[in-house]
């Protein structure tokens, strides 16, 4: 895509494929979220999907639930074959906090082993695993204590992140702390259409700040390690393109 105007905005009406030049070594990949593909989760989104609006209608259209989703938890080997057939070399997936730590302080080793097995299967297929530590979902115990509304709760996310890192560091070199914090904040605390369904701009700002603090603390906890230089740690951003009424694109 080319910038077509002096100001920084895109002309979405045309993508000039011939003008796109990806550098040598550019890594093509695909990504998923645990709740959206694994199935059988028990988190804030599971609760949200089972809830109702004030008028008694289902929170989700038609009362739909993710339920088993596409059963990636059990069919990941088939999915890896599809990824390989697509021709990409990187797969970013999130680890489901509610499965790994269903009760505060109690870690399920079988869930951790599942993600080890996933990483091993990816590497055997020549695909680089990239792990996202938080992709919109919280275990219910964390949600019930206010999740990222309270800065004091960040320590639980850091503890979880360190446990996962120690378990998967032999297989994963690229780590993402939080997926799209602006989406989590705007949809859950500004628009109120995602859990926890609040519409409070001031609280939204506080949550956004705490997510960035959480990212920083996890980054520091992982990079301060003696082997920290061997790992890349970043955050996943979402970009909202905004066009003013006076500069609408034709």
Regions found by a protein language model. Name each.
Residues 95-107:
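Glycine-rich, proline-tolerant flexible connector loops at the mouths of alpha/beta enzymes
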Residues 22-26, 72, 76-79:
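Short N-terminal amphipathic alpha-helix/helix-capping patch enriched in small hydrophobics
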Residues 66, 73, 102-105, 147:
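Short, flexible active-site loop motifs that bind/organize anionic cofactors or intermediates
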